[in-house]
Amino acid sequence: MSIQNEMPGYNDVDQLLNQQGVGLTPAEMHGLISGLLCGGNTDSSWLPMVHDLTNEGLAFGHELAQALRNMHSAISDSLDDDGFLFQLYLPEGDAVSVFDRADALAGWVNHFLLGLGVSQPKLDKVKDETGEAIDDLRNIAQLGYDEDEDQEELEMSLEEIIEYVRVAALLCHDTFSRQQPTAPEVRKPTLH
């Protein structure tokens, strides 16, 4: 299955967010929407939740709303494709430093956890592998670096962390989005 809904361009979303006065980066918005989806929110309530969390409950203008609908659809499609196509939405290019990418990753993770927490209010009760991954994400959200660090080494470490975050998000999606099996009927033995 290929992604039918294409992700809007990072710089385009950045411009639309700035025009609307929304204090989030495209990476943070993608993290928030991804968190809502990975937390099991599959209905149309996601956009009003995003309004509440990012814009004091006010609806976005048409262009930004459409870009976010496209983003939501693209994320949903990539998650539904067994997650193979799901990627974090971070700034790229020669003009983007490794430090900018590290900051964007921390913002993505923070907002992913926000979206996940809104969808799954008892997030702190999650155990096993998913609970450990969520704890790791909380630590990654506080990601720090020393600007004197070797940038090539930091870039390699960052790529490993990005892949770990991607897999952790997929694990959350698998945990919270799968259908809970219904309990089989318990039959009481008939007394004769």
Swiss-Prot record:
It comes from Klebsiella pneumoniae (strain 342). This is UPF0149 protein KPK_0755. Signal peptide: none annotated. Belongs to the UPF0149 family. GO terms for cellular component: cytosol. It holds the Pfam family UPF0149. Gene3D superfamilies: YgfB uncharacterised protein family UPF0149, PF03695. NCBIfam families: PRK01736.1 (NF002477), ygfB_yecA (TIGR02292). InterPro entries: YgfB-like, YgfB-like_sf.
